[in-house]
Structures are given as C-alpha cells and as structure tokens.
Amino acid sequence: MTERKHGLTYADSGVDIDAGNRLVDLIKPMVRATARAGADSEIGGFGGLFDLKAAGFKDPVLVAATDGVGTKIKVAIDAGLHTGIGIDLVAMSVNDLVVQGAEPLFFLDYFACGKLDPEAAAEIVAGVAEACRESGCALIGGETAEMPGLYKDGDYDLAGFSVGAAERGTLLPSKDIAEGDAVIGLASSGVHSNGFSLVRKIVEKSGLPYDAPAPFSPVMTLGGALLAPTKLYVKSCLQAIRDTGAVKGLAHITGGGFTENIPRVLPKHLGVGIDLPRIPVLPVFKWLAEQGEIAELELLRTFNCGIGMVIIVKADAVDQVTESLTASGESVHLLGQVIAAKGEQRVVYDGHLDLAW
C-alpha cells in the first residue's frame, strides 16, 4: 500500500500516542510498588487480575465503590498542586469500602485531559500509588484519555474504582445497632474532597489568590491548605474492627456531611444525638464559615467540619475501640450516642460548633 504524502496523523488531531507511552514508562515503577498478595500490579494487559484465594479469602463477598474528586480538581489546577489529588481519588473509594467492613483489594483509575503532559500526569499517579500502598490496595490498571476539544489544555478530570472483600457474615453495618450505642469520630485532615464548589465561591469572595498565606494557617499557602489530601482510614478502622469485635457501623463523612451520611448506616427507626461542642472544628472550617457567612446547619450538611469518619460501637467498648484506633495514629472523639429517630429527623444536634478563631 502506498502511503499518501502529507496525510493527517492522529497527532495532528491533538492526540499524542508517544506521550501516552511516555506516561506508562514513568508510572510502571510506581504501580509495581503497590503489589500485594493476589496481584502483581504489572500494567499493560487488557485487564487487571486479582487472585482472591492467594489473598487468603475463603468465602468472600465482594464490595465495589467508585468516586471522583469533584471540583477540588479545579483548585489543584489553579494552584498548580497535583500530587494530593491522586491520594484524594483513592481515599474517596477505599474509605467507602471499609465502611462496609471490607478490605480494599485493588484500584483502577481513569484520567481524562485535553492535552497530555506525561510528567504532570505522573505526579497525579504518584499520589494514587502512594494511597494504594497505604491502604494495602493494588493498583492493577487504569485508562488515560486525551480528548482535545472536550477539555481545555491544562484541564483534567479523574475517576477511581475499587473493589474490596469481606468474609461472608462480617459485613457492616451489623444488624444489632441499638439505642445507647456510642458514636465516636475520627479527626479529618481538612476539607477532604467535598464541598469545593462552595469553597471556591468563598475564596473568590475573599479576593485571596491560592498562593497567598492561608489566613487560618499562615505557614501554608491557601491553595496548599485547601488541598490537604483526604485522610485514609482503612488500616486503622480494619484493625479496630478485627481487634475488638465491637464496631457495629461506620459512616464516611463526605458530601451531605453528618446530616446525610450517618443515617445511611442506621436502621430506619434509629438516629443519633451529636454533641456539637465535641466536634474538633478545624481552623479551615472556621474561616470558611466566617467568610461565607455559612449557617451552622449548612456547615454540618456540607462539610466534615473536622470529623472524617464516624463509628458506632458498643457502649461498653468505647475505651477498647479508642485504644485500638489511637494506637493506629487516629485522633478519636466521643460525639454522642444512638437514639430513637424523631420522625424525619435522624441526626439530632445538641449545642453549637465552636467556630471562634
């Protein structure tokens, strides 16, 4: 076949296959470092493999989760800070898996952009790989999509997918959650990955650039503080579940805050009473509340406010569970207890958040 001279190429349309190959070469060592029992984390095949038997499971139930990072990505783009976004991507899925009592097994990511910058993309994947290692989760595959015309140069989006497993009969929440059970919370690392459309609106209102010192943490830039990666709760929570046998349920405090997420793990006739002064409100939320003049109930329905994971435990096992979580490096706070639901109100707040700073 005679090749026509000066014919169009895929590169002429804005898609650079060589750049994609360069990215694969950059990330192979990162991906390989996430290998665990059941997965060798070698990429390049048409599908990722996982051997449940090699991972030690006998009668497993699989649990799947998928999520993104939302408009936090826009803050990362505007601030030029990308590594933490990869951590966020993993955390949003694997934290949801541990809520079900499942051990994360493997993760896949999807990266879409207008023009692929291999080095910048590798920075994001480095964060993904770091979070996978910390969660004991193998990165077994992914997709990079260069889509000129759909995304502007410099813009990108991410999605993640993870699968975990638990032995049959050990899934959470348990069916014996009852009035009087204790509600404890694990401290968050910051805003995590929800509410960023409101965050961006508040930053715009403040007039501060992302490279300005953060008013609530002057040793950091505003962008750096807002982009603090979502905390990974996998290892600490799994350890507490296995050590104590007293964990009845968990709620990952994401979009919808306390108000929407805690009821998701409760029987319909039950709710929780939360003592608001016990929530360790982080300075970032105090600043956001002040700058945005955000009502307290709106804060509680939008942000984690300083608590990223809520755990329901047997009332007589609070000390035991707290000891396990503290040994894993968590900051643990007793927030309240399980109560009878009051009609449509499933989360009852007592007192007020400490928003003074």
Curated annotation (Swiss-Prot):
Q: Which reaction does it catalyse?
A: 2-formamido-N(1)-(5-O-phospho-beta-D-ribosyl)acetamidine + ATP = 5-amino-1-(5-phospho-beta-D-ribosyl)imidazole + ADP + phosphate + H(+)
* Matching Gene3D superfamilies: PurM-like C-terminal domain (3.90.650.10), PurM-like, N-terminal domain (3.30.1330.10)
What EC numbers are recorded for this enzyme? 6.3.3.1
Which Pfam families does the UniProt entry name for this protein? AIRS, AIRS_C
Q: In which pathway does it act?
A: Purine metabolism; IMP biosynthesis via de novo pathway; 5-amino-1-(5-phospho-D-ribosyl)imidazole from N(2)-formyl-N(1)-(5-phospho-D-ribosyl)glycinamide: step 2/2
Q: Which regions form coiled coils? A: none
Q: Name one GO cellular component term.
A: cytosol
Q: Does the keyword DNA repair apply?
A: no
Q: Which GO terms describe its molecular function?
A: ATP binding; phosphoribosylamine-glycine ligase activity; phosphoribosylformylglycinamidine cyclo-ligase activity
Q: What is its main location?
A: cytoplasm
Uppermost EC category: ligase
CDD domains from the UniProt entry? PurM
Q: GO terms for biological process? A: 'de novo' IMP biosynthetic process; adenine biosynthetic process
The keyword Translocase is annotated on this UniProt entry: no
SUPFAM superfamilies per the UniProt record, alphabetical: PurM C-terminal domain-like (SSF56042), PurM N-terminal domain-like (SSF55326)
Annotated keywords: ATP-binding, Cytoplasm, Ligase, Nucleotide-binding, Purine biosynthesis
**Which superkingdom heads the taxonomic lineage of this protein's source?**
Bacteria
Q: Where in the cell is it found?
A: Cytoplasm
InterPro entries (alphabetical) = PurM-like_C_dom, PurM-like_C_sf, PurM-like_N, PurM-like_N_sf, PurM_cligase
HAMAP family noted in UniProt: AIRS
Q: Which family does it belong to?
A: Belongs to the AIR synthase family.
What protein name applies here?
A: Phosphoribosylformylglycinamidine cyclo-ligase
Gene encoding it? purM
